[in-house]
Amino acid sequence: MHRYKITFAYDGSNFAGFQIQPGERTVQQVLERAVNKIAKKPQPPLMVFGSGRTDAGVHALGQVAHFDLPYQIPGPSLVRALNSSLPLDVLVKEATEVAPDFHARFDAHHKRYRYRVVGGEFTNPFKRNYTGHYKYPVDVERMQTAAQDFVGEHDFTSFVASGSQATSNVRRIDEVTVVRDEENDEVVFDFVGNGFLYNQVRIMVAFLLEIGNGRRPVDDVMRVMKAKNRDLARGTAPASGLYLVEVTYDSPANSQND
C-alpha cells in the first residue's frame, strides 16, 4: 500500500462537520467515497484520516488528511482524479506520497485557525455563511492587547465547551493576531497553536469581542483563565466565521516523493 497526504479546502456550509456521522453529509464521507471510487471500490473500503475534526458550518482553506492506495500515482494525477469525483464544495489542492507511518493527526505540529467577523446592525445575507456577525463597535487595539494573554501554555478549561473528549485542557498557543480588514469591513482573528479544544477558538473570539466592546476589562483573560470556570467566559461565536487555514508538519521528513 502507498500512503498519500492531501491538502484540501471546503465550504462547510452544507456539511454536518468533518467526521462521518450516520445519516449526515460530512466531509470525511465525501472524501472516502471519492478515494474508494478511484481505487475501484476495494474491500474492505479505504478510510480517510483527517488532521482533526471541524464542526458543522466551519470551513477549511488548508485541511490535511491521509489515506492508503493499493497502487502508486503521481500527486498531480491524484489531485485531478479526486477533484473529478468530489462535490463542488470540496477542492483538493495538493497530494503527496508520504512515509507509510505518516499520520495526518498525530504528526501535526501546528494549526492555524482564522475567524472573520463582520459588523453592522444587521447581518449581510451574502456573508452570513462565511463570517460571524457582531453588531456592536469594537476597539481592535484593546482586543489585540488582551489576546496576547492567550499566548503560551495554559489550562484552557474556561474556554472549552461541554462535550469535549480531551483528557487534558492544557494547550499551547504560539501566536494570536487581531486586525481590521478595511477592504472587506471585517475584523480578523488568527490563532496558531499545537492544538485546540472543542469550540476553543470560537469561545476566545466571543470573549475578545466583549473586551473590544468595553464589556470586559483588557486584563480579563488571565482572571477567567485562572478560575477554570467555563461560565465566566460566557458566549461562543458562530461556526460560520471559523476557518482552518493550515496544518504544518515537520515535512520533508514525512515526504517520500514530492
From Swiss-Prot:
Catalytically driven reaction(s): uridine(38/39/40) in tRNA = pseudouridine(38/39/40) in tRNA
EC id: 5.4.99.12
Self-association state and partner proteins as the record states: Homodimer.
Residues binding substrate, per UniProt: Y113
GO molecular function list: RNA binding; tRNA pseudouridine(38-40) synthase activity
Family: Belongs to the tRNA pseudouridine synthase TruA family.
Official protein name in the record: tRNA pseudouridine synthase A
Protein role: Formation of pseudouridine at positions 38, 39 and 40 in the anticodon stem and loop of transfer RNAs.
Taxonomic lineage from the root: Bacteria, Bacillati, Bacillota, Bacilli, Lactobacillales
